[in-house]
């Protein structure tokens, strides 16, 4: 056991050291406006050479530092959370492979090497989702893998299409792609790949299903790695989205995703799925602001979101760990009395998610919403942005109401405490980052900020939407004296919203059902029907008839021999006469 513990600790120390080093480097690159291209010649044979290119700028270095910081804390946290697991060694290796795939994707300016990291993320995520090896995990892993395969195919098609340029280093050809309609196909394929990885409609169903993975994986996957890979890829291709049809389409899809996830989280009772739907909502927000053209804002929110979302998942993991793997929030309640540190960190992460002033989420979300108010867009897009923000506060309040207030609703055979210092250290470190991370990043990334001039009522609109969302969360959560839950009055609407607009059903049964039925009819009608009648059975009958004729010839019948002799004589005489 000590060997495994040291394995976790060593990984933690190495990753956190590299993370701080990369962060300092990213500040230097940002202040001095540096970009490094490093070419590594892998094979050189006569006139042929295979060269791998790496791109280092402030954005890639800062993103890598955040990924490694969260990965190191997740591995440290797993030391206790997965401590009793027999295969913890394998688990840590899978997490490290996952992080390496993400590193490959971040520093690649080349579609081929991006595909290596992209596929690595997909394959290792499958191994992590099925880690617990039960039927639910296998189904979730298959849904995750197959959804991401669509994005892999789109990237492969983009690679094939880029053969027109003679190089796969897309970074040099973005302006050319923007001006050439035929090459905008590459932008469309890359956008499709990003939509599958970042779980936008209609590929949203895999993200809550992936909650079958261990909680440390959820903290890593849903904060800074797998789901943000699509957003990061589109940040690199941001020129193609600016003032284009692709950007308008992405704005519609991501806005609907944001709204759907926020609405669904208000009708969900699984603790991890609520946080997963919250992630989906924030991904929709990032994609939306990216489609308008503010890629730096999308990157800023990506980093701040990584901090408080990892903290949310880690706190949820501590709660699940202490309540003997119970995830239904209706069986919780009163946790703040027994787990004060965890609940404090959980509430800080929730407030950061809602956009509470001076926490990490406030600096990015408030800036995004004020920028949206300055942008030219129709009322529908405007409504999606602000209504989804209100829904975020609504489900956050509901989550706290169910899990942390009132009386404990589960069995009494639970040891609720905050005594695990390993998990407590990880969540406390992330809590500090969730408090100071937003202000620190806003000072570093926007050292020449633009002034946003808005009327008084628009300036306070974001705050009013948040307060209204919190009040609505209280109303739909509160059970009155006659025990009529407000969220169950309109059952059909609740069922529709709670099932993510039937997205999981459409993605699984909807895709498979009709091809299976058509395949069965084809098998019955053709394989066992006409093709059997005209193929196997008829061939057998014809051969049987011909074999009977042959048997007649073999009976040594004198009449048949004379007849055949006369027939051949007639044929020969006729041929001789015809030739003469």
Curated annotation (Swiss-Prot):
<feature type="transmembrane region" description="Helical">
    <location>
        <begin position="12"/>
        <end position="32"/>
    </location>
</feature>
<dbReference type="InterPro" id="IPR001516">
    <property type="entry name" value="Proton_antipo_N"/>
</dbReference>
<feature type="transmembrane region" description="Helical">
    <location>
        <begin position="343"/>
        <end position="363"/>
    </location>
</feature>
<dbReference type="GO" id="GO:0005743">
    <property type="term" value="C:mitochondrial inner membrane"/>
</dbReference>
<feature type="transmembrane region" description="Helical">
    <location>
        <begin position="50"/>
        <end position="70"/>
    </location>
</feature>
<dbReference type="GO" id="GO:0015990">
    <property type="term" value="P:electron transport coupled proton transport"/>
</dbReference>
<dbReference type="Pfam" id="PF00361">
    <property type="entry name" value="Proton_antipo_M"/>
</dbReference>
<keyword id="KW-0999">Mitochondrion inner membrane</keyword>
<keyword id="KW-0249">Electron transport</keyword>
<feature type="transmembrane region" description="Helical">
    <location>
        <begin position="378"/>
        <end position="400"/>
    </location>
</feature>
<comment type="function">
    <text>Core subunit of the mitochondrial membrane respiratory chain NADH dehydrogenase (Complex I) that is believed to belong to the minimal assembly required for catalysis. Complex I functions in the transfer of electrons from NADH to the respiratory chain. The immediate electron acceptor for the enzyme is believed to be ubiquinone.</text>
</comment>
<dbReference type="InterPro" id="IPR003945">
    <property type="entry name" value="NU5C-like"/>
</dbReference>
<feature type="transmembrane region" description="Helical">
    <location>
        <begin position="153"/>
        <end position="173"/>
    </location>
</feature>
<keyword id="KW-0813">Transport</keyword>
<feature type="transmembrane region" description="Helical">
    <location>
        <begin position="113"/>
        <end position="133"/>
    </location>
</feature>
<dbReference type="InterPro" id="IPR001750">
    <property type="entry name" value="ND/Mrp_TM"/>
</dbReference>
<feature type="transmembrane region" description="Helical">
    <location>
        <begin position="300"/>
        <end position="320"/>
    </location>
</feature>
<protein>
    <recommendedName>
        <fullName>NADH-ubiquinone oxidoreductase chain 5</fullName>
        <ecNumber>7.1.1.2</ecNumber>
    </recommendedName>
</protein>
<dbReference type="InterPro" id="IPR010934">
    <property type="entry name" value="NADH_DH_su5_C"/>
</dbReference>
<feature type="transmembrane region" description="Helical">
    <location>
        <begin position="500"/>
        <end position="520"/>
    </location>
</feature>
<dbReference type="GO" id="GO:0008137">
    <property type="term" value="F:NADH dehydrogenase (ubiquinone) activity"/>
</dbReference>
<feature type="transmembrane region" description="Helical">
    <location>
        <begin position="249"/>
        <end position="269"/>
    </location>
</feature>
<keyword id="KW-1133">Transmembrane helix</keyword>
<feature type="transmembrane region" description="Helical">
    <location>
        <begin position="427"/>
        <end position="447"/>
    </location>
</feature>
<keyword id="KW-1278">Translocase</keyword>
<keyword id="KW-0496">Mitochondrion</keyword>
<feature type="transmembrane region" description="Helical">
    <location>
        <begin position="560"/>
        <end position="580"/>
    </location>
</feature>
<dbReference type="Pfam" id="PF00662">
    <property type="entry name" value="Proton_antipo_N"/>
</dbReference>
<feature type="transmembrane region" description="Helical">
    <location>
        <begin position="176"/>
        <end position="196"/>
    </location>
</feature>
<keyword id="KW-0830">Ubiquinone</keyword>
<comment type="similarity">
    <text>Belongs to the complex I subunit 5 family.</text>
</comment>
<feature type="transmembrane region" description="Helical">
    <location>
        <begin position="274"/>
        <end position="294"/>
    </location>
</feature>
<feature type="transmembrane region" description="Helical">
    <location>
        <begin position="464"/>
        <end position="484"/>
    </location>
</feature>
<dbReference type="Pfam" id="PF06455">
    <property type="entry name" value="NADH5_C"/>
</dbReference>
<keyword id="KW-0812">Transmembrane</keyword>
<keyword id="KW-0520">NAD</keyword>
<keyword id="KW-0679">Respiratory chain</keyword>
<dbReference type="GO" id="GO:0042773">
    <property type="term" value="P:ATP synthesis coupled electron transport"/>
</dbReference>
<feature type="transmembrane region" description="Helical">
    <location>
        <begin position="92"/>
        <end position="112"/>
    </location>
</feature>
<feature type="transmembrane region" description="Helical">
    <location>
        <begin position="218"/>
        <end position="240"/>
    </location>
</feature>
<keyword id="KW-0472">Membrane</keyword>
């Amino acid at each position: 056991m000590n060997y495994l513990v040291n394995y976790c600790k060593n990984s933690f120390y190495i990753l956190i050291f590299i993370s701080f080093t990369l962060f300092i480097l990213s500040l230097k690159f940002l202040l001095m406006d540096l970009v490094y291209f490093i070419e590594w010649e892998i094979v050189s044979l006569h006139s042929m050479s295979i060269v791998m290119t790496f791109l280092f700028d402030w954005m890639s270095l800062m993103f890598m530092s955040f990924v490694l910081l969260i990965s190191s804390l997740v591995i440290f946290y797993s030391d206790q959370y997965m401590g009793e697991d027999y295969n913890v060694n394998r688990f840590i290796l899978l997490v490290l492979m996952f992080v390496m795939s993400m590193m490959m994707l971040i520093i690649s300016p080349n579609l081929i090497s991006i595909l290596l990291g992209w596929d690595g993320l997909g394959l290792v995520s499958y191994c992590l989702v099925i880690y617990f090896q039960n039927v639910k995990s296998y189904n979730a892993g298959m849904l995750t893998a197959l959804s991401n395969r669509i994005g892999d195919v789109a990237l492969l098609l983009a690679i094939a299409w880029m053969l027109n340029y003679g190089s796969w280093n897309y970074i040099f050809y973005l302006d050319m792609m923007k001006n050439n309609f035929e090459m905008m196909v590459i932008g469309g394929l890359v956008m499709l790949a990003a939509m599958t990885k970042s779980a936008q409609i209609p590929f949203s169903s895999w993200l809550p299903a992936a909650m079958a993975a261990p909680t440390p994986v959820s903290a890593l996957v849903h904060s800074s790695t797998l789901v943000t890979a699509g957003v990061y890829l589109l940040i690199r291709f941001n020129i193609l989205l600016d003032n284009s049809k692709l950007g308008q389409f992405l704005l519609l899809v991501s806005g609907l995703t944001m709204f759907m996830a926020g609405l669904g989280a208000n009708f969900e009772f699984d603790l991890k799925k609520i946080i997963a739907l919250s992630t989906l909502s924030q991904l929709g927000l990032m994609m939306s602001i990216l489609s308008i053209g503010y890629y730096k804002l999308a990157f800023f929110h990506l980093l701040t979101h990584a901090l408080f979302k990892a903290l949310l998942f880690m706190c949820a993991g501590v709660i699940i760990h202490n309540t003997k793997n119970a995830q239904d929030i209706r069986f919780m309640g009163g946790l703040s009395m027994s787990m004060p540190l965890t609940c404090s960190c959980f509430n800080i992460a929730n407030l950061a998610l809602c956009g509470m002033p001076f926490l990490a989420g406030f600096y990015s979300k408030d800036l995004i919403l004020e920028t949206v108010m300055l942008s030219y867009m129709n009322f529908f897009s405007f409504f999606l942005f602000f209504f989804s923000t209100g829904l975020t506060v609504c489900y956050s309040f509901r989550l706290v109401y169910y899990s942390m207030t009132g009386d404990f609703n589960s069995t009494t055979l639970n040891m609720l405490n905050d005594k695990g210092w390993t998990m407590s250290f990880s969540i406390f470190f992330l809590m500090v980052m969730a408090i100071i991370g937003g202000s620190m990043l806003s000072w570093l990334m926007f050292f020449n900020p633009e002034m946003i001039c808005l009327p008084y009522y628009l300036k306070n609109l974001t705050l009013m939407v948040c307060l209204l969302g919190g009040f609505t969360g209280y109303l739909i959560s509160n059970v009155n004296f006659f025990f009529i839950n407000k969220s169950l009055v309109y059952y059909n609407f609740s069922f529709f919203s709670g099932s993510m607009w039937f997205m999981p059903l459409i993605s699984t049964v909807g895709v498979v059902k009709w091809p299976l039925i058509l395949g069965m009819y084809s098998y019955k009608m053709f394989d066992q029907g006409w093709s059997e009648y005209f193929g196997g059975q008829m061939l057998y009958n014809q051969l049987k008839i011909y074999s009977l004729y042959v048997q007649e010839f073999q009976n040594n019948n004198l009449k048949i021999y004379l007849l055949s002799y006369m027939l051949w004589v007639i044929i020969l005489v006729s041929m001789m006469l015809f030739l003469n």
